[in-house]
Amino acid sequence: MNKKYIYLAGPIAQCSYKEANDWRDYVRNNLHENIIGISPLRCEPMHGETYGPGNDSRYNSPGAIAAKNWYDTEHCNLILAYLPRELNERRPSYGTVIEIGWAIGLRKPIILVTDDEYLTEHPLIKANVN
C-alpha cells in the first residue's frame, strides 16, 4: 500500500518545544501505519526556550523556511492545520494561514482544527477548508 503524507501546519514562532510539538506528536502517534505526519520543525533548532529566527541560513533564513514549507505543502496528500484562537496571547499563526493559502492554490484537501468561532465562520475558510 502506498504511503500518504499529512503536513502538520500550526504555530511555531515564539512557541516552546512543548507548544509546538506536543500536538504534532499526538497526531503522528495516532495515524494509520501507512500515513506519515510531516512536521515543519524537523530542521528548525530551538533558540533558548522558543523557536524563532536563527543565524544558520541553511535552515533559518526566511527563504530556507519558506522553501521547505512550500515543498512539504506541495508534496503532501493533505494539510492538517491547527489554528488555536490564542496561544500565549499570540494569534493567529501567520505562517499557517499562508500554508492554508498554498494548499488551496494547490487544490490539497485541508482539515482545520480550531477553537476560533470567527475563523470557522469566515467565508473564505468555509468555502475552501474541509
Describe the function of each predicted region:
Residues 1-130:
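Conserved catalytic or regulatory cores that recognize and/or transform ribose-phosphate-containing ligands
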